[in-house]
């Protein structure tokens, strides 16, 4: 079966910044440009397997030009838009690159706002910053084997924007968006010895732990990685199989690079010179007796399946919050009974195969998946092909682990965090001590209480650990004397008659083109994956061979016994206790964010696929979470250094103070509406300083300008005056101001909601709201004094002081 390509939707270039001062000028609609971008609503969970990707019903099969609204206006002949800098003639293409890297094309991320990359959120400075940021991202993607030096842009960026270049470059490097990976030019920048006094203990050498450790070493930290297994990689495990003079490498864990657009693991693969094999769309299905499925019946049932998924989306929209307490499985079964149009056994078997595929995509039973949020990560799909990596994903793991200090067979059972550091206790009682720790153990281990935290984790984090689901996928890998299956396909499927066994060997992966030998992999999903945990390996292999012989022997093809076979048991593996996470009934995407939160005043951090709301249950999600936490650890370390300096004099470290400010506002002294306040000085002094934070949500201001007075400015203005965020989501912005305690209390008493408070703040009090950097150095001392006061108030209740350092490991 062949599949249609993912839909592409041309978006009109809608207005953003700045507003148009000439609202009565109307452009010629025929000349209105459009931007063709991948449709983010493409059903990710239906294609995560890397094959049989289908359009949802009613989706366009080809791009359709969409003109901008007639109300869109051309730009003024002279306006603030003329201050937009010109870097090149391809800002639209660079915006698309930013989108694939996880950035909004025309706005800032929360992390950028918190880092204070611009002093005026929403102005021309932000527009120019985004142009520079997108250009840096694009250049990095083009030159990933080289170190991207800031100096190479000195002649390209106007002098008045040097500070924006510095801010963008610093942010992208520190957050792992550029200059990461394993290219020689990147590795030679890693310091031979630590340049910082901070010690970080990383628990777990999976992709998250390796990504974080590698970054932290590059940033100059002292790092040690504690791994319970005898190998690195965690749930990414490439097994070398041998027998009869044959050998092959099979991925028993994470196996598919899901999407190549912007995937950082794709960058690492390219740095290693590894070709990526696109998983071909052809996926024939076979009935329980081994005969091929009728193509027309297959087409009909697949259409019914997609129709019911679409109807389930409409159903949850109509149910509102009630959908949080309903499973996807219950919704699909109800819809099938009322509108399923499945009349024969073959049609029901085919439908159950699609359900098994859906359970594979989520590593969870449909009866456990949340109807409301099971696909909450779909808008962030990387896009692009799904691929196998020749030789297995273990090649990525080995490259990332190179020169990273890893101590194997160290099973962590206790993590303590105190006022001055952390202690990590491993099997045998050995204690590792450091300044900070990063926990990357799988959600299954956290659910089972495999690691004890002292003090106990906050209740909100414990609740999220309990709410999120952690499912199971198992495999049977078989090395044969020769390839007897078709060489023009990478996948084929098999139907079962018993619905409770629908996930049993329902899908086969052919690794013959990428493993170096005749390797075939049978997948076990859903309820069958749990039953498989106790199935004797010989019985499992016999069942697989029976299926294969039922398919191929009627065609006159002999199926030999395998030379070697391996059965996985991820559910009972004590270091994983499952495969990957999903949003269970009662949970939401918020729970991923909560799992990612640090605890212990920035001493204990968390990473892993179950800590990323956008990319859960993926290898690249785990990798990205490690880069994220390396950045967070660095920010907190800088904040502590800044605090130490502030006690002697005000700090000029902007990012460090930004991190301090972010921490302080986690527990504001005063909250009302979208406003929160932290107080400094004496409570009895009405003139004592305070810092106000305002959360601005909802749609951004929309100007109506378009076009340009010069060709070289044309695309820049169109992009940043008209392009809406690709994800079409409302962005929350945070702005700040310094004021007195008395003014803050007056503001709280203003009636009429946030709009009236904003009016009072700006018009009556004459206060200007700015980004973090706009607060200026005067705020740094206030921030530091508030932090010092809070630390002082906690002194009596803090755990005892811990020694810093890493003991010599016992061999």
UniProtKB/Swiss-Prot annotation:
Compositionally biased spans, kind Low complexity: 56-71
Compositionally skewed regions (Pro residues) per UniProt: 1-10
Keyword flag Nucleotide-binding: no
Sorted UniProt keywords: Chromatin regulator, FAD, Flavoprotein, Oxidoreductase
GO BP term, pick one: chromatin organization
Domain of life of the native organism: Eukaryota
Compositional bias of kind Basic residues: 44-55
Pfam families reported for this sequence: Amino_oxidase, SWIRM
UniProt protein name: Lysine-specific histone demethylase 1 homolog 3
